[in-house]
Design a protein with these regions (language model features):
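Conserved Rossmann-fold cofactor-binding substructure of NAD(P)-dependent oxidoreductases
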Residues: 57-70
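Hydrophobic/small residue at the entry helix of a nucleotide-binding pocket
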Residues: 12-13
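Active-site-lining helix/loop region of Rossmann-like oxidoreductase modules
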Residues: 7, 142-196
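Rossmann-fold cofactor-recognition segment
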Residues: 45-59
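Helix N-cap at the beta1-alpha1 junction of Rossmann-like dinucleotide-binding domains, i.e.
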Residues: 33-37
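Rossmann-fold NAD(P)-binding glycine/threonine-rich loop
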Residues: 101-124
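Beta-loop-alpha module in the N-terminal Rossmann-like domain of NAD(P)-dependent dehydrogenases
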Residues: 62, 74-91, 105-106
Length: 196
């Protein structure tokens, strides 16, 4: 049985916890700053193998104490990007595998530096984009002898938009604003370049 701590019981974290629990090979601890969402999720869906817990990464000593009392193999952070360096530090301290869904380049670089030489896997950017979209783009490129340009777009565009952005907010609003407000990078002529 694999033991995983999922931090953040929003839409994505709750979905991850459900999918892992339904596999039947995971013991999931679902942590959030209150018990309301994780507990309701477990009760409403009658999930077995999911333990709701109150964890707030703004108090890393408390999270560390929880990890000492409830050993897990991995942490998956579905928290806002700015929380992930703290979570990665906890994973390093406790010798755990680390995964996150961040899109933030600076945070990813911090985690890369933090995890240098770690004995366990540190895998930031495991979400849809970057993450899956990078894997899909790579696979598509392998089907061609030469590739000039690859443009992949990802979005949650609802049939009936209900907000000014005309976008479905299925993930962190903090992350969405951060992603659209910061410089992004691409590869041109084999070199990493900033894009406007």
């Amino acid at each position: 049985m694999h033991r995983v701590l999922v931090l953040g019981a929003g839409k994505i974290g709750s979905l991850v916890a459900c999918l892992l629990a339904q596999r039947g090979t995971y013991e999931v601890h679902l942590g959030d700053i209150t018990l309301t969402t994780p507990k309701r999720l477990v009760e409403d869906l009658r999930l077995e193998g999911v333990t709701p817990c109150i964890l707030d990464v703004r108090h890393p000593d408390a999270v560390s104490a929880y990890l000492s009392a409830h050993p897990v193999d991995a942490i998956l952070s579905s928290l806002p990007y700015f929380c992930n360096p703290t979570v990665a530090g906890l994973a390093l301290t406790h010798g755990l595998h680390y995964f996150d869904l961040t899109e933030d380049i600076e945070v990813t670089n911090q985690i890369k530096i933090l995890s240098a030489g770690a004995a366990h896997a540190f895998m930031p950017q495991c979400g849809l984009a970057p993450g899956f979209i990078s894997i899909a783009a790579h696979d598509l490129m392998t089907h061609f002898e030469t590739v000039d340009t690859v443009k992949m777009r990802v979005g949650a565009l609802p049939v009936h938009p209900s907000n000014a952005l005309k976008y479905s907010l299925t993930w962190s609003t903090d992350g969405l604003i951060n992603e659209y407000g910061n410089l992004c990078y691409g590869i041109e002529a084999g070199a990493k370049v900033p894009l406007q």
